[in-house]
Amino acid sequence: MKKINRNKPVPWTVLSLALAATILMLGLQPRTSLAEDLVVYKSPTCGCCKKWVKHMRDNGFNVVVHEQYNVTPKKDEYGVPRRLRSCHTAKIGGYVVEGHVPADVVKQLLEEKPAIAGLAVPGMPMGSPGMEGFRKDPYDVISFTSTGKTGIHASR
């Protein structure tokens, strides 16, 4: 009968502990990307749109960009009310995201799943993601339904 040396750990025990520690650490790490793509339609010449895309990527979104000079047909297709339109249009999780909507508001939208068509930040307010500069203007994130009903979803 072979004698076990208590001073030398059994390889399977060490391997099991290492595997358990790895699984635990992976489970505790924050998500770095969301499962579904954020599909963005924007003009290839728009600098603030590029900055908004970077903001979304920096906040864990996997962004797929479609560059086209005329984004209006996508806005029409997705039912974005004319008074809420901005420079770029995106879609994720069945929702429309119009303009410079902050990443945390989009994450909240995807978690809460309200009965709306999407969110919009009309125009291009200074201080919104992608429009950072020397000043920060207050702005609202507007929710809208497929029938055109709107409401203030968040204020910044």
For the regions a language model picked out, list residue spans one by one.
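N-terminal secretory signal peptides that target proteins for export/translocation
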Residues: 1-8
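Bacterial N-terminal signal peptides
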Residues: 16-25
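Local sequence-structure signature of Cys/Sec-based thiol-disulfide redox active-site neighborhoods
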Residues: 34-53, 57-59
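Short active-site oxyanion
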Residues: 37-38, 61-63, 93-96
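Stable alpha-helical elements in mature extracytoplasmic
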Residues: 45, 52, 67-70, 102-106
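Conserved helix-turn-beta segment immediately C-terminal to the redox Cys motif
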Residues: 53-73
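Thiol/selenol-based redox catalytic cores and closely related redox-interacting motifs
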Residues: 77, 83-156
